[in-house]
Amino acid sequence: MQQIDFYMVDAFTSTTFGGNPAAVCPLDQWLPDQLMQKMAKQHNQSETAFFVANDDGFELRWFTTQSEINLCGHATLAAAHVIFEHLKYPHNTINFTTRFVGPLSVSREGEWLTLDFPVWLSEPVQQPPALLTECLGITGYREVRAARDYLVVLENQQQVEAIRPDTFAMLSLDKMVCVTAPGDGEYDFVSRFFCPGEGVAEDPVTGSAHSMLIPYWADRLGKTQLLAYQKSERGGELRCQLNGDRVLIGGQAKTYLVGKVWLD
């Protein structure tokens, strides 16, 4: 019987029960894709990160309960936390290779981990689908853009907080949905992220969406260093920086659970 270490980590938070939880499984070698998919479904977290050490660092993959995905920020942060804290990685930067988005890295400075991700530039959507505003329950917006996800820009933080989406109706959209606005106080911008098609009605903290949010707000606010907050029930703070064609996304993480997966 094969035993695999299992960790559950709350990412983008300094306290347990905050941020976004992810499952993490270090592997000696890759398991069959079908088996990793079954494991991710059994873990019942929004994402499970699997990684295997290689000569340059680690190969990293992410699975939702339904499928493998191309990028996941909070599960990358969670995997890096496990490598630094539990596997006692001796260096301050972890280099990951991925199947879909090329090389990624995570650096450590004190309690903060910083993701180095590619920029995702969004384009204006001149005629957004009516279903988009209907399922968000809004009648107006500052603008709508699209990249991997729809980006719906509202006027203020209160409007973002007031969203009560129809996530069942949202299943008919062809993209996931990010809602954002300028922050009221200490935060430059706030956001929420809805992805019912991935099995998650509202994602607590979405690192990958900030690959799109950071270049947008850097341009609008005229600054390259930003402080962001995702206004979900659990919530999460992100230190953000635009660095050319890359974004730096900083957060903290806390281990919630350590255990073993037993495979026949």
Where are the model-predicted features located?
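Active-site proximal loop and beta-alpha junction motif in alpha/beta enzyme cores
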Residues: M1-L71, L77-D264
